[in-house]
Regions:
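Conserved, mostly hydrophobic/aromatic
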Residues: 13, 57, 79, 120, ...
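Glycine/Thr-rich beta-alpha phosphate-binding loop at enzyme active sites
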Residues: 22, 26-29, 33-37, 173-186, ...
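Short beta-strand/loop segments at the ligand-binding rim of alpha/beta enzyme cores
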Residues: 49-56, 130-135, 200-219, 281-291
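Catalytic cores of alpha/beta
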Residues: 64-73, 219-233, 281-285, 295-312
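Glycine-rich phosphate-binding active-site loops on the catalytic face of alpha/beta enzymes
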Residues: 75-89, 170-172, 238-246, 294-295, ...
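A gly/proline- and charged-residue-enriched helix-loop-helix capping module
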Residues: 82, 86-132
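C-terminal helical cap(s) of enzyme catalytic domains, especially alpha/beta-barrels
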Residues: 88-104, 249-261, 317-334
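Active-site glycine- and acidic-residue-rich loops that bind
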Residues: 140-153, 186, 212-232
Length: 334
C-alpha cells in the first residue's frame, strides 16, 4: 500500500508531506481505520523496562507527541517523541528538510522546532497509549551553551511523570554548539546534574525513570572512549547511537551534498554502526545501547543487534519503506 502512496508524497515538499502524513495518521487512528498490529512479538528488557518488542520509533518524527496512538498502532515496541525544549521555538528557516532518494537519505536542519514541553505534556495526557514512551529533551536555541543544563533540567522535571524513559539529546548538528556538550568535562557536568535531579524526582514521584543520552556518529575513538567513561562513571541508564551525520561525502556530487544539516538514512548506516561497535566494546554490557541510523531493512536491524544494541529505532527507513519496515525488522529479530 505504502509503495503506491510514496510516489505521490515524494512529489511534495518534504516538510509539507511530513505534516500531511502525520495529520493523516492521526485522523485514521481516531476513526479506527488503522489496523491494529500485534506488538507483543519479542519481549525485551531495556533499561529495566519491559518492551513488547525491540523495534522503536526514533525521535524527530513526532516532535510534539501529536501522533502517539497512531504510531503505537503500527506495531512499535516503544515510541520516542521530541526533541522538545522548555519554550516553544520555530526552528530554522525553511526549506530545512530534503529527501535524497538516489541515496535513500534525508537531510534536515530543522533546529528543534517544537511547541514546548507544556504543549507536549498536554498531548501525552490526551493520548490513550499505555506502552513504553520515551521523551527526547533538548535546549532552546536562545539559551547560551553554558546554561544548557538549565533547559535540560526544566524538561526533565516536567517530563518525568509522563515518560517511561527520557533521552538527553546533545548530538543534533542543527543547534549551535550543542555537540560541544559531548566533550568530557561538559558531558560529565551535564549528566551529573541530570542524574542528581533524577534521584530527587524518583523520590518525589515514587518511580524511577531511566535516563539515556543520544550521541553523534561523527566521533573519533578518543571521543568514544571519553563518552564511554563518563556514562559509566555517572551511571547513565542507556545510550542511543546515533544521531544524524554532518559528513555528506557519501553523496558525492549530488546537488544536495552542499546543504547544511544532518544526513540520515542509508548514508549514515556505516558510520553509525562503527560508533555502535566501538561503544559496545567499551561499555562491555554495563548499560544498554539503542541502535539507530540507517536501518532500511530487517537485515540492518539484525546487524545493529549483532554489533551490541539491545534495541533499535527507525525513522528515515520508515519514510522510504513505510510500515512494512517495522514488520520486516520484527521478523528479522525473532
Amino acid at each position: 500500500m505504502y509503495s503506491l502512496v510514496r510516489p505521490i508524497l515524494f512529489r511534495f515538499d518534504a516538510e509539507k508531506a511530513h505534516h500531511f502524513t502525520l495529520n493523516s495518521l492521526r485522523t485514521a487512528e481516531k476513526l479506527g481505520l488503522l489496523p491494529k498490529v500485534d506488538s507483543h512479538t519479542r519481549p525485551t528488557e531495556l533499561m529495566g523496562l519491559q518492551l513488547p518488542n525491540p523495534v522503536g520509533l526514533a525521535a524527530g518524527l513526532d516532535k510534539n507527541g501529536e501522533c502517539i496512538d497512531a504510531f503505537a498502532a503500527l506495531g512499535f515496541g516503544f515510541v520516542e517523541i521530541g526533541t522538545v525544549t522548555p519554550k516553544p521555538q520555530p526552528g530554522n528557516p525553511q526549506p530545512r528538510l530534503f529527501r535524497v532518494p538516489e541515496h535513500q537519505g534525508i537531510i534536515n536542519r530543522m533546529g528543534f522546532n517544537n511547541h514546548g514541553i507544556d504543549a507536549m505534556i498536554r498531548n501525552i495526557e490526551n493520548s490513550r497509549f499505555k506502552g513504553i514512551l520515551g521523551i527526547n529533551i533538548g535546549k532552546n536555541a536562545v539559551t547560551p551553551i553554558e546554561n544548557a543544563a538549565d533547559d535540560y533540567l526544566i524538561c526533565l522535571e516536567k517530563a518525568y511523570a509522563h515518560a517511561s524513559y527520557i533521552t538527553v539529546n546533545i548530538s543534533s548538528p542543527n543547534t549551535k554548539n550543542l555537540r560541544a556538550l559531548q566533550g568530557g568535562d561538559e558531558l560529565s557536568a551535564l549528566l551529573e546534574a541530570l542524574k542528581n535531579k533524577q534521584a530527587q524526582l524518583a523520590a518525589a514521584h515514587g518511580k524511577y525513570v531511566p535516563l539515556a543520552v543520544k550521541i553523534a556518529p561523527d566521533l573519533d575513538e578518543a571521543q568514544i572512549d571519553d563518552i564511554a567513561h563518563v556514562v559509566k562513571s555517572v551511571e547513565m541508564d542507556g545510550i542511543i547511537a546515533t544521531n544524524t551525520t554532518i559528513d555528506k561525502s557519501s553523496l558525492g556530487s549530488h546537488p544536495l551534498a552542499s546543504e547544511q544539516g544532518g544526513l540520515s538514512g542509508l548514508p549514515v548506516r556505516e558510520k553509525s554502526n562503527q560508533v555502535l561497535k566501538l561503544l559496545a566494546e567499551r561499555i562491555d554490557s554495563k548499560l544498554p545501547i539503542i541502535g539507530v541510523g540507517g536501518i532500511m531493512s530487517g537485515a540492518d536491524a539484525a546487524e545493529k543487534i549483532r554489533l551490541g544494541a539491545s534495541a533499535v529505532q527507525v525513522y528515515s527507513g520508515l519514510i522510504y519503506r513505510g510500515p512494512e519496515l517495522i514488520k520486516e525488522c520484527l521478523a528479522a529479530l525473532k
